[in-house]
């Protein structure tokens, strides 16, 4: 059995490489040759020969945008003068980003399982971008980082460059298959500080997050959006940003509101206005109207704090004597007149405070009503402060007319609690970035504050004890307590003096009088300066880092759309310039001995185009060919381009399209309209098996390191080649257990000079109406080649705004478009054990970032890694192919 895999990686080489027309090098001897694999992209199938490439050859992207012929059944191409040796003394040339590096093969073998170690394997020329003309492997990666990676192979020590950003270095390490924990201790802080900065940057909301979310919620500009808004505001404890995200998720998901359910008119009104009103009072940078509301709130906060301070000034206080007649406690005695002294503030201050409380009450009620998550809202410390600062005023107004003793006690308590009003100052954090930075700095510097407190506590205890005994030296023997000549009568009193001295305040209320006490005081002052000077710079640096990051994020350019899909441009690795198809060889009955390839079949109404496919036999399951004639139909997938047209959307465009919610729908035959959720429609179709098994379940614990999380999520497999052989009855299925291929010319006994093809047998009443006829002769031993487009693999969904670092790796899960209907075996006598090989990002520790995975699509698929499952979760129901062989069923 033969299989070959054509892969289109986004990190392909930029520009056009020189095409070499030199003859193909001689393959490796049979005893050292690996299983047949696809030759490198530069390997072209010979035009003349006994068998030639099929017409309508599958479109694949080779170096420089040239089309690579999908030669199947050819042995691995031998490398040139450096790569073909196979011994440890042979040299190998690696071109990384235009910079050539030369090293020994034995050096690359020092770290087995990595990408560079794979260059020393016999089939490396087929698996990587190998140029036989220059005898070098090309990688379009960062050349500066690669120098450190290569030195790691040479010296065994991994150092981090100081001029490279940490996330970039981490991504490069993941591409080369190196664990970040191998970084040397001397460079760990340099490597870590970039990640700390990245995490700190994520703690501040992006300046366009609220604007985009409002726009996505629908009609945000009606609320007065300003395109020049700055950074979004958030609460002191970060709850504001989370509530914004919850609000926009709720609006986008169609959550119902108090006026009605999601499906009714009330729900529609709620979904439209809830995010707008919430942003109006919560995010001052979301719209121009929100700015006016923020200015009003800031004005009332300042007025309330000013009123609170003026109430204690003598100029605004009136002292009055009120006489109250009270019954005498003695029976029969006349009533007593009691004069009470009352302190009253100016009445206009009370009125001003009442107006401020009315505004705060209105603001609080609006935020509670339109909050997307009431529980999260009540957990916020700022919201608790708002509620506590409002309640005393209403209680005081309600109890002011009562004259009972209990009411007076409550009023006295409420007057004491009125100091909570001063906490409204923290509401300014919604309007000033510096105050939010201060809050982040205090939380980030908790360890430094604890260290400072411990140092001060130790110094206070030591110097308070020393000053007590130092002042006893030279004291009068008759003064036992020392109260006549010193202030330090006991050690606890010395605590206050030690704190004042170590913090260099020096109130002067206590000071030593003896020479020994003065010496202790000098030592205490010096120790205090050194103690405070050590952790303070760390705190200051944290504040500076947070503030600079906040300013940088606030000044980021406004991005309404993260990415605008556009077709690939000529010269990019995602643009195909297909060569004209070669002329068909002579008919085998005319003496050439070749095999006529079938014409390409283009299904009229399906989402997948199959180039060079063969018409199905009578036993082919209808689900296999659903949606078009003669093609391997996978529903809801983008079509392959016609010759001369650019390739489908580039990988980042596909990802951004999926993120925007523009997922491709399932297309029924003859129906160009999307049919709803691709996954639901595919699973509900009668021809589809229940393909709902994720690629890696969350409970499978893969040894993923922090450095390997989230890398290569933008990689994808562009083309996919199966190794189906048509059976004699005309159906296309895997020839499991079939004998090896006969010695074809140019396959095993001679250098590769042809591309063998095969056709199914002509059956009575075949092909069906409207399908292209098949050639009359069949060669069941030769493999049939199918090119199928698959969408990229995506990581499991996480809530928006969540940082994907820090140990939260959800695993890999197929997107809805990958839950494709392929078909079940129609009967036990005609099994269709389809096997597709696709290159996807690997999430395993110290494995190549792109591994070959097997899909037995006749059953609910589970992924089997192409590395033997050495460090990945095993599935007992599927065999694991060896690393250097094609997957087997």
Swiss-Prot record:
Residues 24-42 have a biased composition (Pro residues). N-glycosylated. K(+) binds at residues 504-507. It is found in: Cell membrane; Presynaptic cell membrane; Perikaryon; Cell projection, Axon. Signal peptide: none annotated. Zn(2+) binds at residues 159, 165, 186-187. Residues 1-80 are annotated as: Important for normal N-type inactivation. GO terms for cellular component: axolemma; axon terminus; calyx of Held; cell cortex; cytoskeleton; dendrite; dendrite membrane; dendritic spine membrane. Keywords: Cell membrane, Cell projection, Cytoplasm, Cytoskeleton, Glycoprotein, Ion channel, Ion transport, Membrane, Metal-binding, Methylation, Phosphoprotein, Postsynaptic cell membrane, Potassium, Potassium channel, Potassium transport, Synapse, Transmembrane, Transmembrane helix, Transport, Voltage-gated channel, Zinc. The keyword Cell membrane applies. The segment S4 is probably the voltage-sensor and is characterized by a series of positively charged amino acids at every third position. Homotetramer. Heterotetramer with KCNC1. Interacts (via C-terminus) with HAX1; this interaction modulates channel gating. Identified in a complex with ACTR3, a subunit of the Arp2/3 complex; this interaction is indirect and depends on the presence of HAX1. Belongs to the potassium channel family. C (Shaw) (TC 1.A.1.2) subfamily. Kv3.3/KCNC3 sub-subfamily. This is Voltage-gated potassium channel KCNC3. It comes from Rattus norvegicus (Rat). The gene is Kcnc3.
């Amino acid at each position: 059995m033969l299989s070959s895999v054509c892969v289109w990686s986004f990190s392909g080489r930029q520009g056009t490489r020189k095409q070499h027309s030199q003859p193909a090098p001689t393959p490796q001897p049979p005893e050292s040759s690996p299983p047949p694999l696809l030759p490198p992209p530069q390997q072209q199938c010979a035009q003349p020969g006994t068998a030639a490439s099929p017409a309508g050859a599958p479109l694949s992207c080779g170096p420089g945008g040239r089309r690579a012929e999908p030669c199947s059944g050819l042995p691995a191409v031998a490398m040139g003068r450096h790569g073909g040796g196979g011994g440890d003394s042979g040299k190998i040339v690696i071109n990384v980003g235009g910079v050539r590096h030369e090293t020994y093969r034995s050096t690359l073998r020092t770290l087995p399982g990595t990408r560079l170690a794979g260059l020393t394997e016999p089939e490396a020329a087929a698996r990587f971008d190998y140029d036989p003309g220059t005898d070098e492997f090309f990688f379009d990666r960062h050349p500066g980082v690669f120098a450190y990676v290569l030195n790691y192979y040479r010296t065994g020590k991994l150092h981090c460059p100081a001029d490279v950003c940490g996330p970039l270095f981490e991504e490069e390490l993941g591409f080369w298959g190196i664990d970040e924990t191998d970084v040397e201790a001397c460079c760990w802080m340099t490597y870590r500080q970039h990640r700390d900065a990245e995490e700190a940057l994520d703690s501040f909301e992006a300046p366009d997050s609220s604007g985009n979310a409002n726009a996505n919620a629908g009609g945000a500009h009606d609320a007065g959006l300003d395109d020049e808004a700055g950074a979004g505001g958030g609460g002191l404890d970060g709850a504001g940003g989370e509530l914004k995200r919850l609000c926009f998720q709720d609006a986008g998901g169609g959550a119902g509101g108090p006026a009605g359910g999601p499906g009714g008119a009330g729900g529609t009104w709620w979904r439209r206005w809830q995010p707008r009103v919430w942003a109006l009072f919560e995010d001052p940078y979301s719209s121009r109207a929100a700015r006016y509301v923020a200015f009003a709130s800031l004005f009332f906060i300042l007025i309330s704090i000013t009123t609170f301070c003026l109430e204690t000034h003598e100029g605004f206080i009136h002292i009055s004597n009120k006489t109250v007649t009270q019954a005498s406690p003695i029976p029969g005695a006349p009533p007593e007149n009691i004069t009470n002294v009352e302190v009253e503030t100016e009445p206009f201050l009370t009125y001003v405070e009442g107006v401020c409380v009315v505004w705060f009450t209105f603001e609080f009620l609006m935020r509670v009503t339109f909050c997307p998550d009431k529980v999260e809202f009540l957990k916020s410390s700022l919201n608790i402060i708002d509620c506590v600062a409002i309640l005393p005023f209403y209680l005081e107004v309600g109890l002011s007319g009562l004259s009972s003793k209990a009411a007076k006690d409550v009023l006295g308590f409420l007057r004491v609690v009125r100091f909570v009003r001063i906490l409204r100052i923290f509401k300014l954090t919604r309007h000033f970035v510096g105050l939010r930075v201060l809050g982040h700095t205090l939380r980030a510097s908790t360890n430094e504050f604890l260290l400072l407190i411990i140092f001060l506590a130790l110094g206070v205890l030591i110097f308070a004890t020393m000053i007590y005994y130092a002042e006893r030296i030279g004291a009068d023997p008759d003064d036992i307590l020392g109260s006549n000549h010193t202030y330090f009568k006991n050690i606890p009193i010395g605590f206050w003096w030690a704190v004042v001295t170590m913090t260099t305040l020096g109130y002067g209320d206590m000071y030593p009088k003896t020479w020994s006490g003065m010496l202790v005081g000098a030592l205490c002052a010096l120790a205090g300066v050194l103690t405070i000077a050590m952790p303070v710079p760390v705190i200051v640096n944290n504040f500076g880092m947070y503030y600079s990051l906040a300013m940088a994020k606030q000044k980021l350019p406004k991005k309404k759309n993260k990415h605008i899909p556009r077709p690939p441009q000529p010269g990019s690795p995602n643009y195909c310039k297909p060569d004209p198809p070669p002329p068909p060889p002579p008919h085998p009955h005319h003496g050439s001995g070749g095999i006529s390839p079938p014409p390409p079949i283009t299904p009229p109404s399906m989402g997948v185009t199959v180039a060079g496919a063969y018409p199905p036999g009578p036993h082919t399951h209808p689900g296999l060919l659903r949606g078009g004639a003669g093609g391997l139909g996978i529903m809801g997938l983008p079509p392959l381009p016609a010759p001369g047209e650019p390739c489908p959307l580039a990988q980042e465009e596909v990802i951004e399209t999926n993120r925007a919610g523009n997922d491709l729908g399932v297309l029924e035959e003859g129906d160009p309209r999307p049919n709803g959720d691709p996954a639901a429609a595919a699973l509900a179709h009668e021809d589809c098996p229940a393909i709902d098994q994720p690629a890696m379940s969350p409970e499978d614990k893969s040894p993923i390191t922090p450095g390997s999380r989230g890398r290569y999520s933008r990689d994808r497999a562009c083309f996919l080649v199966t190794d189906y052989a048509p059976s004699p009855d005309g159906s296309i299925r895997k020839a499991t257990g079939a004998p090896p291929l006969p010695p074809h010319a140019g396959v095993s006994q001679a250098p590769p000079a042809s591309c063998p093809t095969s056709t199914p047998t002509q059956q009575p009443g075949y092909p069906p109406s409207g399908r292209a006829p098949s050639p009359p002769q069949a060669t069941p031993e030769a493999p049939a080649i199918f090119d199928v487009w698959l969408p990229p693999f995506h990581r499991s969904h996480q809530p928006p705004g969540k940082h994907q670092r820090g140990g939260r790796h959800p695993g890999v899960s197929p997107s809805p478009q990958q839950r494709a209907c392929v078909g079940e075996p129609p009967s036990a006598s005609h099994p269709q054990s389809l096997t597709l090989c696709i290159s996807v990002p690997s999430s395993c520790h110290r494995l190549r970032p792109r591994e070959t995975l097997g899909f037995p699509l006749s059953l609910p698929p589970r992924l089997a890694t192409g590395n033997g499952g050495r460090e990945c979760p095993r599935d007992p129901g599927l065999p694991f192919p060896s690393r250097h062989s094609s997957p087997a069923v």
